[in-house]
């Protein structure tokens, strides 16, 4: 076997520094915290603090954007990846990022930072696919993603359900198969959060109600709540909280 050349001490330090930087930028983070609002001259930014670092989550915006902002007076589960590039609105950017608002009231979550010269909100990014909420494999198969411990449907997920119904009606299909899943999330500190028992049933019941309300016959909705929970890994946990819809001929 051919041996690799021995690196000098200086070269080793340089390589370690480069690899260390790459690992930091690729690091996945998952933590629960109070969200922070940073006021700017244009629109507010949402930030979060973890282990002494401030992270940029996104701008306050409309329901059509992929990022749904947290709420003051509520803790939030932040799941994201540290992105390369300069700080944004005073924080290291997380992209992609998924935020899940916890329903319990916490009055301590009320920090609003004032406008500061040199700290600006980024311009609104061009509209893109709502990857935090919906992924489609063709017109007949769609996966909807959910906030932790929630059956809330965003504008994106509601629109996706409507399109599935249109596909069902246009193709004169026989059924729509619905499977709902309960997820879990591994925090960066090692704690594992498990969604409440029954959340998959709540999600499948809500989707069934919407489908039937849009004209799909009750007998044509084949709905299952999956009881098994995928083990969290701290990387792609947001995608374990889902409902799949498939139009069947």
Task: Give short role names for the model-derived ranges.
Residues 63-79:
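Short nucleic-acid-contacting surface segments enriched for D/E, G, S/T with interspersed K/R
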Residues 182-249:
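Periplasmic OmpA-like peptidoglycan-binding domain that tethers envelope proteins to the cell wall
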